[in-house]
Amino acid sequence: MGKNIKIAFKHVSKEYDLYQNKSDKIKGLFMPKSQKMQSFWALRDVSFDIHDGETVGLIGINGSGKSTISSIMSGVIPPTQGEVVINGETSLIAIAVGLKGPLTGYENIRLKLLMHGMKSSQINKLMPSIIEFADIGDFINQPIKNYSSGMRSRLGFAISVHTNPDILVIDEALSVGDQTFYEKCVNKINEFKARGKTIVFVSHSLGQVKSLCDRIIWMHHGEIREMGEAKEVAQKYDEFVKWFNKQPNDYKKKYQKEHKEHQKAPQKKVYPNPNANKYRLTLFDKFLLTALIVLTILFGTLVATGKSFKGLISETSTNQVEQIAYVDNNEITIR
């Protein structure tokens, strides 16, 4: 193509452990790898390059791995296997990603820009433009936990496009909101394209992807099914969707079940992750992290109920303590 590679996925796979209950998540931290629970491969051996200035669409049915790819691209989660190379600063636009519910819209803008390394003077200059673009009125001074999904998307999009990223990853952010805001977003995307920015566009809307993208990657149950020119791949995907929708419900359920069972099967070939050690937790790290989470939740319970620590423990059975100690898989069960 003659352009520099901006994003490279090399044999990338992402594995999640499947647990029967919440307490098993903590137990899994201390189990040997050979005794781990059943796994689910959200991505399996995915490889592609995205070049400087390209706009590439990611399409596929629910659970195909689109959002997993966008999260790995943006550094939200690491891959389990394979290598990811990102040449530039990435900004992920998805509904409520990185926004803090208790903070107001105004406070979230300031926090996000501070995290991008901006000085207070720079933030003050950008603030009016971001608020105007988001166009959420007086809600800018309200906690975003009270926002609708459309309002959160507006604010997230407005912040991200004003950070001037090299790579813009848009994950279903245009699926909410009215037509006026959608057109405003499309104009901004086209402006970014004219400036030679690299854009990854994740959407269920085939019309949006065809109109905005140069190439399309069609994900299907964690694997790449087709990749190529936008019109060609979009036509094949459209034909598949029409065919699938015509099938009886029993066949649809069987089809999806078979593919999900395939995603639970062990990876046949292992590709090393060069950065794996950066994400691996030692046994001591796991112990400290688990203890911190349990104590934090217990303390929060004490504050909420007004009980003493001794009184709480006397009323809490071992099973209840295990129920309290809930850890999210994405955050600490990474291998």
Curated annotation (Swiss-Prot):
Signal sequence segment: none
Binding sites annotated in the UniProt record for ATP = 60-67
Membrane association type = Peripheral membrane protein
**Location relative to the cell:** Cell membrane
- Which Gene3D superfamilies does this chain map to? P-loop containing nucleotide triphosphate hydrolases
- Which Gene Ontology cellular component terms are annotated? plasma membrane
User: Cross-referenced InterPro entries, in alphabetical order?
Assistant: AAA+_ATPase (IPR003593), ABC_transporter-like_ATP-bd (IPR003439), ABC_transporter-like_CS (IPR017871), ABC_transpr_TagH-like (IPR015860), Bact_Polysacc_Export_ATP-bd (IPR050683), P-loop_NTPase (IPR027417)
Q: Give the reactions, separated by semicolons, that this protein catalyses.
A: ATP + H2O + teichoic acidSide 1 = ADP + phosphate + teichoic acidSide 2
Domain annotation ABC transporter: ranges: 26-246
Q: Which GO terms describe its molecular function?
A: ABC-type teichoic acid transporter activity; ATP binding; ATP hydrolysis activity
Q: What is its EC number?
A: 7.5.2.4
Top-tier EC class:
translocase
Looking at the record's lineage, which domain of life comes first?
Answer: Bacteria
UniProtKB keywords: ATP-binding, Cell membrane, Membrane, Nucleotide-binding, Translocase, Transport
* Family affiliation: Belongs to the ABC transporter superfamily. Teichoic acids exporter (TC 3.A.1.104.1) family.
Subunit arrangement?
The complex is composed of two ATP-binding proteins (TagH) and two transmembrane proteins (TagG).
PANTHER family linked: TEICHOIC ACIDS EXPORT ATP-BINDING PROTEIN TAGH
Purpose of the protein: Part of the ABC transporter complex TagGH involved in teichoic acids export. Responsible for energy coupling to the transport system.
- In its UniProt entry, what is this protein called? Teichoic acids export ATP-binding protein TagH
